[in-house]
Amino acid sequence: MTRIRRGYIARRRRTKIRLFASTFRGSHSRLTRTTTQQKIRALVSAHRDRGKQKRYFRRLWITRINAVIRDNRVFYSYSRLIHDLYKKQLLLNRKILAQIAISNRNCLYMISNEIIK
């Protein structure tokens, strides 16, 4: 059986993979088989961690809101605040509430006082 020379197609494919893996360390950026495996692994990790990132940020927002809410001036818990927000139909998500809690605490206190009434 004669050997088939692949031509520019295989070279183009390998070049594309090498460009993707150019910032990897050691043989992970030089050897073709290793770069292919590392590319697959990198994309799997990126896909998995996009889901994790959403979870981590939600946890961070909840922690920030809870820390400000449990301050001395408002005798409220996070779960009661969210429950009352839904009852009053105030559509503020956790991200916005966390930004308000950090930048302008008085505004969050005003919101919670309006809910209590």
Curated annotation (Swiss-Prot):
KW Chloroplast (keyword) present: yes
Location of this chain's protein in the cell: Plastid, Chloroplast
Keyword Flavoprotein annotated: no
Keywords of this entry: Chloroplast, Plastid, Ribonucleoprotein, Ribosomal protein, RNA-binding, rRNA-binding
GO molecular function annotations of the record: rRNA binding; structural constituent of ribosome
Gene Ontology cellular component list: chloroplast; ribonucleoprotein complex; ribosome
Main subcellular location: plastid
GO BP term, pick one: ribosomal large subunit assembly
Pfam families: Ribosomal_L20 (PF00453)
PANTHER family: 39S RIBOSOMAL PROTEIN L20
Job of this protein: Binds directly to 23S ribosomal RNA and is necessary for the in vitro assembly process of the 50S ribosomal subunit. It is not involved in the protein synthesizing functions of that subunit.
Alphabetical list of HAMAP family matching this protein: Ribosomal_bL20
Family indicated by similarity: Belongs to the bacterial ribosomal protein bL20 family.
Protein's recorded name: Large ribosomal subunit protein bL20c
